[in-house]
């Protein structure tokens, strides 16, 4: 897992949606699920040669479309979103905000859903993971490989079944030794003179 679940929810997603006057629990959960599926809650910010960026893996062309074809019709909303971005860097490197600015990236992720007429999720469906998976796959997903089942599995593992205060990455590879190695110059360590000296489809 990447970012602490509770902190991502309470310090990033919720205040961003509140700033945009768009908060409801269902949308908050949908964005958490989107981050879980796209980047394992921020474990990956740029995956190999894929074009997606940040915790939501938003593609640059999608980012441009939101500004050029959607926000252009909503000046007050555009002003609120622009206020979340860096004052100067945004003008020179707008797409880098998707990686470095969590609240801005969250606003753009929400706008991707909003531009598809997904404004809010009913309170009764706030925990409906099947519905969220369908919304993600229909309006957000930009590659052919992942499925709604993948979204549901990511949500179950990283959102529903996660310790919300756990910020440690869950790595199943080689484990650290139970005892740290002895200092180089201590007896038996070998030392320097001893003998026993890692959106279009990407």
Regions found by a protein language model. Give the residues of each.
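Export/targeting segments at the very N-terminus of extracytoplasmic proteins
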Residues: 1-42
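Sec/Tat-exported extracytoplasmic proteins
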Residues: 16-20, 38-39, 45, 112-117, ...
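Acidic helix/loop microenvironments that form the catalytic cleft of cell-wall polysaccharide enzymes
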Residues: 35-39, 120-146
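Substrate-binding/active-site groove segments that recognize
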Residues: 50-88
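Substrate-binding/catalytic groove segments of enzymes
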Residues: 65-68, 89, 93, 113-129
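Alpha-helix-centered segments that form part of catalytic cores
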Residues: 88-111
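Long, charge-rich low-complexity segments
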Residues: 148-184, 190
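Long, low-complexity, intrinsically disordered segments
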Residues: 182-202
């Amino acid at each position: 897992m990447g970012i602490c679940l509770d902190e991502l929810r309470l310090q990033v997603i919720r205040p961003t949606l509140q700033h945009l006057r768009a908060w409801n629990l269902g949308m908050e959960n949908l964005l958490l699920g989107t981050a879980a599926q796209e980047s394992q809650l921020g474990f990956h910010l740029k995956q190999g040669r894929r074009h997606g960026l940040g915790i939501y893996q938003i593609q640059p062309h999608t980012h441009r479309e939101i500004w050029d074809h959607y926000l252009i019709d909503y000046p007050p909303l555009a002003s609120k979103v622009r206020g979340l971005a860096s004052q100067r860097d945004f003008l020179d490197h707008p797409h880098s905000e998707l990686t470095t600015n969590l609240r801005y990236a969250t606003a753009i992720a929400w706008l991707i859903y909003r531009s598809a007429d997904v404004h809010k999720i009913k309170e009764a469906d706030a925990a409906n993971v099947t519905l969220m998976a369908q919304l993600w796959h229909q309006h957000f997903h930009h590659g052919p490989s992942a499925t709604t089942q993948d979204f549901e599995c990511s949500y179950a593992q990283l959102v529903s079944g996660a310790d919300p205060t756990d910020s440690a990455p869950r790595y199943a590879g080689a484990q650290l030794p139970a005892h740290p190695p002895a200092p180089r110059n201590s007896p038996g360590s070998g030392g320097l003179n001893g003998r026993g000296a890692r959106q279009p489809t990407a």
